[in-house]
Amino acid sequence: MRKDIHPEYRPVVFMDTSTGYQFLSGSTKRSNETVEFEGETYPLIRVEISSDSHPFYTGRQKFTQADGRVDRFNKKYGLK
C-alpha cells in the first residue's frame, strides 16, 4: 500500500438520533463533535436509523403489498 493516500481508520461512536442509542465502531468518517463513551472520548457521528430503530431489527415491521405493473394490468383486463 502507498503511504498517505488512505483515510484514517479510527474508533468512533455512532448515535441513533431517534432513540439515543450509542455504539462504538470503526470508521473513516470525520466529525467535529465528540462524546464520552465508556470513559474515553471519541468522535460522534449522528445517524437517523440504526439497528436499534430500524423496523426490520426491532420486529415492528409492516408488510405492505404494492401493486406492480403486472398486477394493475391483470386487474384492468380482469385476468386471474
From Swiss-Prot:
Protein name as catalogued: Large ribosomal subunit protein bL31B
Family designation? Belongs to the bacterial ribosomal protein bL31 family. Type B subfamily.
Q: Which organism is it from?
A: Streptococcus sanguinis (strain SK36)
How is the subunit organization of this protein annotated in UniProt?
Answer: Part of the 50S ribosomal subunit.
The record's Gene Ontology cellular component field reads: ribonucleoprotein complex; ribosome
The entry lists its GO molecular-function terms as: structural constituent of ribosome
Please provide the Gene Ontology terms (biological process) for this protein. Answer: translation
What does the UniProt keyword field contain? Ribonucleoprotein, Ribosomal protein
The source's domain of life comes to Bacteria
The family database entries (InterPro entries) matched by this protein are listed as: Ribosomal_bL28/bL31-like_sf, Ribosomal_bL31, Ribosomal_bL31_B, Ribosomal_bL31_sf
Cross-referenced Pfam families: Ribosomal_L31
Q: Which PROSITE patterns match?
A: RIBOSOMAL_L31
